[in-house]
């Protein structure tokens, strides 16, 4: 993408996370599929090409989800919506549940893609020589409204809930 991040506002009319236009090696190109699926698919393609040439690789994969506009894949939204119908989430209210089904639907897709990436590394004998690091860039956007591990604050705020992030390393 032609900047340090993929903006929340579409660069092209009609870019809605599905079948969008991205820049690859300086050329605009339309890709088929959901944005996060496309990014992971292209990353795996790059890793396999590098491996087949016996070249070491560094792949920094930064997704644009979960950021607004919150448009998850329908299967992910429906799954989260069903989970949120459980009694233990009744206190959240319907509007928050609707918003969470979008936000957490995007996170579910990232989780699914991380799992596929780990299987890809295993299946292609790349795991033993690859360090996989997963971390996020900031705390939760929703903050303590639904879950923030008991921390005060949320994204853009100075408290722990805004800047403490998960970090997982697999080697």
Model segments located where?
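Active-site-proximal cap/lid insertion segments
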Residues: 1-171
